[in-house]
Amino acid sequence: MQIVFKATQRVEQGTGASRRLRRAGQIPGIIYGADTDAQAITVDHNELYHLLKKETFHASVLMIELEGAKHTVVLRDVQWHPYKQQVLHLDFQRIDAGHQLHLKVPLHFINNDTNPAVKLGGCMISHTMTELDIACLPANLPEFIEVDLQSLEAGQSIHVSQLKLPEGVEAVHHGEGDPVVATALTVKGGAAEATEGEVAA
């Protein structure tokens, strides 16, 4: 089910206006993109604070209801207070159904505890990555990418190229090589060490 929330047009801008909004329980934000003028908005802090705690909110197509109009967006940036549980600012990007999105989605690791190298071989599995940069059309955007650890052997690694991505989804590599997603490390003397067979990044 698509996440929908309401926003209000923000008229006053600047540091002072933003502080007043935050004191009133509102979060200043902006909607931009899709060859349309940027719109300054405010949203309810309590509502968005709880939505931000949901993993799906960060990797889903969202719907903002603003002054009678609906905007299809993705979350692009969140600014948090350095020590308070307070959201300071939000950036949303409008999306076009016919244009590819570039977004980070979380990785979900399965079968860690049933992996033979963990159960019988005295290994532990190190998760090198927790999210993956992808490119896809909005309709193909997955909430997460599953990483199956069942067959990972001691000293071996799973690389990005080995992930089973949903149809229409591509991994976006930054730089050269094939990044490591997870590695099975042997445990010696209380510390985890890669065996000689470990595949380098």
From Swiss-Prot:
A single GO molecular function term of this UniProt record: structural constituent of ribosome
Any one cellular component term from GO for this entry?
cytosolic large ribosomal subunit
UniProt cross-references to Pfam families, sorted A to Z: Ribosomal_L25p (PF01386), Ribosomal_TL5_C (PF14693)
Its BP terms in the Gene Ontology are: translation
User: Record's superkingdom?
Assistant: Bacteria
What InterPro entries would the database entry show? Rbsml_bL25/Gln-tRNA_synth_N, Ribosomal_bL25/Gln-tRNA_synth, Ribosomal_bL25_b-dom, Ribosomal_bL25_C, Ribosomal_bL25_long, Ribosomal_bL25_short, Ribosomal_L25_dom, Ribosomal_uL5_bac-type
Return the CDD domains for the record: Ribosomal_L25_TL5_CTC (cd00495)
Keywords in alphabetical order, please. Answer: Ribonucleoprotein, Ribosomal protein, RNA-binding, rRNA-binding
Q: Which family does it belong to?
A: Belongs to the bacterial ribosomal protein bL25 family. CTC subfamily.
Its quaternary structure? Part of the 50S ribosomal subunit; part of the 5S rRNA/L5/L18/L25 subcomplex. Contacts the 5S rRNA. Binds to the 5S rRNA independently of L5 and L18.
Q: Read off the HAMAP family from this record.
A: Ribosomal_bL25 (MF_01336), Ribosomal_bL25_CTC (MF_01334)
Reported function = This is one of the proteins that binds to the 5S RNA in the ribosome where it forms part of the central protuberance.
Name-wise, this protein is Large ribosomal subunit protein bL25
